[in-house]
Amino acid sequence: MPKLKAPKKSAPKKQAPDPPGCRAGLPHIPADYGLKPRKHYLPFSHAEERLAKSRNYWICTARPDGRPHSIPVWGFWIDGVLYFGTGRASRKARNLAHNAAVSIHLDSGDDVVILEGTAVEIDLSDKSQLKKLDAASRAKYKMPMVVGPGNVIYSVRPRVVLAWTEKDFPNNATRWKFDTASA
């Protein structure tokens, strides 16, 4: 009887490089989980795809008295930055005026992406920026971007991004840290 040949092992897929100024590593997970530093983490493209495709983004801010506030918004992931708008009198805008630190996560608890950063109000007189955001809104939500004196649009560059999938947790849990100087 002829010997069966073992299937050839394919070379591991080459991971796309992470963005400049970004380092992948392990998130802070208790030692009981048994995680050890490894050579390969989730590629940042995994997080970027989820951020770009997500319909809703949960924005988490803190009230001036420190109490948390979470609310879903629509937004756009464009060129490594998350944009979202709101009414200037909204709770989230008032919170961000007091403390611009923000944590943002997507809907899924099975394919997790969490972004931490600082919300920066964009200049509404920058017509090229508004045109880009309006085009993104029309493509994604089939409606124009709402811009006016009662509104504010924020940009959030990531400082930290966390991601994992439920089926491979904790083995694929990944944290990307961004150099703030490169933002």
Positions of PLM-derived features:
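Charged, gly/pro-rich active-site loop segments
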Residues: 2-42, 111-183
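Short, conserved active-site entrance elements at the starts or edges of catalytic domains
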Residues: 31-64
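Active-site phosphate/pyrophosphate- and oxyanion-stabilizing loops and adjacent acidic/basic residues
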Residues: 45, 94, 135
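Generic structural signal for secondary-structure transition and capping sites
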Residues: 55-56, 101, 142, 161
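A generic local structural motif
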Residues: 43-46, 69-71, 89, 141
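Short, solvent-exposed cationic patches
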Residues: 32-39, 89-109, 144
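Short beta-strand segments
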Residues: 54-88, 94-96, 102-106, 114-118
